[in-house]
Curated annotation (Swiss-Prot):
Gene name for this UniProt entry: rplM
Highest taxon of the lineage: Bacteria
Protein name in the entry: Large ribosomal subunit protein uL13
SUPFAM superfamilies xrefs: Ribosomal protein L13
Subunit and interaction comment: Part of the 50S ribosomal subunit.
Gene3D superfamilies according to UniProt: Ribosomal protein L13
Family stated for the protein in its record: Belongs to the universal ribosomal protein uL13 family.
Signal peptide: none
PROSITE patterns tied to this protein: RIBOSOMAL_L13 (PS00783)
Keyword Ribonucleoprotein: yes
Length: 143
């Protein structure tokens, strides 16, 4: 009898990849990152096991938003109190915290459960082209 291979959590080997966000559309970049974080690029992908790799995103400040999204698209958050809805447009968000824009886009594409919260921790985003992860010997992602 043949059965489908299911990865075990202790068998998963993780790699580190770097992605340059310069002039890449935010959504397309985020979907590519989410695929790597989930492990869907591997033949050993198993839905209930975190088989993904680590991703280092560089030059987050140079990410591209097409059309008028830079000024018209908003990110909303709520404090939990009445009247506590806060809105910030992406132009302000990219000027103040460019890392946050990519993190939010990727987080929306990951599962909304314990596994998704574990996956988002493997994402490292930096505004410039410097990162402190040289010891992990990251490879550039060829996607």
């Amino acid at each position: 009898m043949r059965t489908t291979y299911m990865a075990k959590p202790h068998e998963v080997e993780r790699k580190w990849y770097t992605i340059d966000a310069t002039n890449k559309p935010l959504g397309r970049l985020a979907s590519e990152i989410a695929e790597i974080l989930r492990g869907k690029h591997k033949p050993t992908f198993t839905p209930h096991v975190d088989t993904g790799d680590y991703v280092i995103v560089l030059n987050a400040e140079k990410v591209l938003l097409t059309g008028k999204k830079r000024t018209q698209k908003h990110h909303y958050r709520h404090s939990g109190y009445p009247g506590g809805l806060k809105a910030i447009n992406y132009e302000t968000l990219l000027n103040t915290k460019p890392e946050k824009a990519i993190e939010l886009a990727v987080k929306g594409m990951l599962p909304k459960n314990r596994l998704g919260r574990k996956m988002i921790k493997k994402l490292k985003v930096y505004a410039g082209d410097e990162h402190p992860h040289q010891a992990q010997q990251p490879e550039p992602w060829e996607g």
